[in-house]
Protein backbone atom coordinates (compact mmCIF):
# COMPACT_ATOMS: atom_id res chain seq x y z
CA UNK A 1 0.00 0.00 0.00
CA UNK A 2 1.34 3.41 -0.96
CA UNK A 3 0.05 6.63 0.57
CA UNK A 4 -0.49 9.84 -1.37
CA UNK A 5 -1.49 12.67 0.95
CA UNK A 6 -4.28 15.01 -0.06
CA UNK A 7 -4.47 18.80 0.21
CA UNK A 8 -2.01 20.26 2.77
CA UNK A 9 -1.17 16.98 4.49
CA UNK A 10 2.25 15.38 4.83
CA UNK A 11 3.37 11.86 5.68
CA UNK A 12 6.17 11.71 8.23
CA UNK A 13 8.23 8.81 9.60
CA UNK A 14 9.44 9.37 13.16
CA UNK A 15 13.19 9.45 13.66
CA UNK A 16 14.05 7.53 16.80
CA UNK A 17 15.86 9.54 19.45
CA UNK A 18 19.07 8.48 21.12
CA UNK A 19 18.65 5.82 23.83
CA UNK A 20 21.84 6.86 25.62
CA UNK A 21 22.49 10.26 27.18
CA UNK A 22 25.69 12.23 26.64
CA UNK A 23 26.97 10.97 30.00
CA UNK A 24 26.39 7.33 28.99
CA UNK A 25 23.15 6.64 30.85
CA UNK A 26 20.91 4.22 28.94
CA UNK A 27 17.26 5.26 28.73
CA UNK A 28 14.90 2.25 28.84
CA UNK A 29 12.17 2.02 26.19
CA UNK A 30 9.35 2.48 28.71
CA UNK A 31 10.88 5.76 29.98
CA UNK A 32 11.69 7.22 26.58
CA UNK A 33 9.29 9.77 25.13
CA UNK A 34 7.93 9.63 21.60
CA UNK A 35 10.34 11.26 19.17
CA UNK A 36 9.30 14.70 18.03
CA UNK A 37 11.39 14.68 14.85
CA UNK A 38 10.75 12.92 11.59
CA UNK A 39 11.50 12.70 7.91
CA UNK A 40 8.92 13.81 5.37
CA UNK A 41 8.11 10.88 3.07
CA UNK A 42 5.35 12.47 0.97
CA UNK A 43 3.57 15.81 0.61
CA UNK A 44 0.16 16.72 -0.73
CA UNK A 45 -0.37 19.14 -3.63
CA UNK A 46 -1.15 22.09 -1.36
CA UNK A 47 -4.06 24.13 -0.09
CA UNK A 48 -6.39 26.40 -2.03
CA UNK A 49 -6.72 30.03 -0.98
CA UNK A 50 -9.90 32.14 -1.10
CA UNK A 51 -9.41 32.76 -4.83
CA UNK A 52 -9.16 29.04 -5.57
CA UNK A 53 -5.42 29.20 -6.32
CA UNK A 54 -3.33 26.25 -5.18
CA UNK A 55 -0.62 27.22 -2.68
CA UNK A 56 2.24 24.70 -2.56
CA UNK A 57 3.55 23.42 0.77
CA UNK A 58 6.75 24.76 2.35
CA UNK A 59 8.14 21.30 3.14
CA UNK A 60 9.42 18.76 0.65
CA UNK A 61 10.19 15.06 0.63
CA UNK A 62 13.36 14.35 2.61
CA UNK A 63 13.05 17.33 4.98
CA UNK A 64 13.66 16.67 8.67
CA UNK A 65 10.88 18.32 10.66
CA UNK A 66 9.88 19.02 14.26
CA UNK A 67 6.33 18.43 15.49
CA UNK A 68 4.37 17.98 18.72
CA UNK A 69 4.40 14.65 20.55
CA UNK A 70 0.71 14.09 19.89
CA UNK A 71 0.53 15.57 16.38
CA UNK A 72 -0.96 13.69 13.47
CA UNK A 73 -2.74 10.41 12.97
CA UNK A 74 -0.68 7.21 13.20
CA UNK A 75 -1.09 4.67 10.38
CA UNK A 76 0.70 1.37 9.79
CA UNK A 77 2.11 0.68 6.34
CA UNK A 78 4.29 -2.40 5.71
CA UNK A 79 5.13 -2.73 9.43
CA UNK A 80 6.17 0.94 9.61
CA UNK A 81 4.31 3.42 11.77
CA UNK A 82 3.82 6.65 9.86
CA UNK A 83 2.16 9.93 10.78
CA UNK A 84 -0.31 11.77 8.58
CA UNK A 85 -0.61 15.41 9.59
CA UNK A 86 -1.37 18.85 8.24
CA UNK A 87 1.52 21.13 7.41
CA UNK A 88 0.22 23.49 10.13
CA UNK A 89 1.06 20.80 12.73
CA UNK A 90 4.76 21.05 11.87
CA UNK A 91 6.84 23.45 13.97
CA UNK A 92 10.04 23.75 11.94
CA UNK A 93 12.35 22.25 9.33
CA UNK A 94 15.72 21.16 10.75
CA UNK A 95 18.45 22.66 8.56
CA UNK A 96 21.62 20.61 8.06
UniProtKB/Swiss-Prot annotation:
The lineage of its organism: Bacteria, Pseudomonadati, Pseudomonadota, Betaproteobacteria, Burkholderiales. This is Co-chaperonin GroES. GO terms for biological process: chaperone cofactor-dependent protein refolding. The keyword Chaperone applies. Together with the chaperonin GroEL, plays an essential role in assisting protein folding. The GroEL-GroES system forms a nano-cage that allows encapsulation of the non-native substrate proteins and provides a physical environment optimized to promote and accelerate protein folding. GroES binds to the apical surface of the GroEL ring, thereby capping the opening of the GroEL channel. Keywords: Chaperone, Cytoplasm. Its main location: cytoplasm. GO terms for cellular component: cytoplasm. SUPFAM superfamilies: GroES-like.
Amino acid sequence: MNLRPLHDRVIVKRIESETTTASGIVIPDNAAEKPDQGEVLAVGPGKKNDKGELIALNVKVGDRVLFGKYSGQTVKVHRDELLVMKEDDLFAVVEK
